[in-house]
């Protein structure tokens, strides 16, 4: 049902941002995914159920957060739910209106650019090639980094298994006491190395954001001479393009982080299986160690083969975004359903503004002298 999609959104939020505070992006993701899942099914018969589900999922974001509840968090939770519910209703009402506005905007743009259709198509084609040149090295770098990090992880973990096998052969009488420290150290190393792996791979997606901004700005400059009296409409379309491209970059970052977490979760049971076998006989333990060694290699290799191509896949998606823009601005565009990206961008802007306003109010609440006396909470 609708709830299922929202639960998946919350699961992604948990993987990509385990923070002590709820943030604007998390809330916007839940509202947008909920709106998208509803689609055209927002019938009056289930309106009250849908609202209660949305309220439930937003409240879930505030559960199990670290630290005590602050005045800001408490105020946020009280104000957020009615704000989000109203925003969701507005999304439903504004969708068709915005769809018509975007259709008219593209119609005006195409009419203005039609005399220069060949030049415009050429400029976008040039921009595609520039984008490929910009992003190509990053895709290669990601693949290289994935290979390197996977090899390092394998090299760092294998010695622990080998040491446990050696200890097992030498201490058959006291297996549990002898192997426990090694198993615990292996567990700690798995957690540490996977975090380091994420730390090295996820910045790749952040670098792509900068390249996207540069490329869209160059495209704006190259098309400006052909859209002098419709520049605002062209800018709006390019803002939508940049939003979609950056969204792909954020999704790439989330996928890398999620796959690293999957790797961790895949390795943990293997280490635990050794712990569980310690109370049995040496033969059981030997089998567990053999499986640990084999499965460790397999898990790391699966990660390498899955994540390695992410860069190339991302680059193809970026080229597709530019090709879609070329089609939209071309004389044979036909009907293009792209108003939803603008609707999502507007939603995220509104949620971000809501959070910023609330935080500004909170920051202005304490008396000014209290800022000088940092150890004293309430200006005492």
Curated annotation (Swiss-Prot):
Protein's recorded name: Apolipoprotein A-IV
Sequence repeat feature ranges: 33-54, 60-81, 82-103, 115-136, 137-158, 159-180, 181-202, 203-224, 225-246, 247-268, 269-286, 287-308, 309-330
Region spans: 13 X 22 AA approximate tandem repeats: 33-330
Compartmental location: Secreted
UniProt similarity note: Belongs to the apolipoprotein A1/A4/E family.
Stated role: May have a role in chylomicrons and VLDL secretion and catabolism. Required for efficient activation of lipoprotein lipase by ApoC-II; potent activator of LCAT. Apoa-IV is a major component of HDL and chylomicrons.
Domain notes: Nine of the thirteen 22-amino acid tandem repeats (each 22-mer is actually a tandem array of two, A and B, related 11-mers) occurring in this sequence are predicted to be highly alpha-helical, and many of these helices are amphipathic. They may therefore serve as lipid-binding domains with lecithin:cholesterol acyltransferase (LCAT) activating abilities.
Organism listed in the record: Bos taurus
Span list, region Disordered: 361-380
Lineage of origin: Eukaryota, Metazoa, Chordata, Craniata, Vertebrata
Record-level GO cellular component terms: chylomicron; extracellular vesicle; high-density lipoprotein particle; low-density lipoprotein particle; very-low-density lipoprotein particle
GO biological process, one term: phospholipid efflux
Tissue-level expression: Secreted in plasma.
Subunit structure: Homodimer.
Keywords: Chylomicron, HDL, Lipid transport, Repeat, Secreted, Signal, Transport
MF annotations from Gene Ontology: cholesterol transfer activity; phosphatidylcholine-sterol O-acyltransferase activator activity; phospholipid binding
Signal peptide interval: 1-20
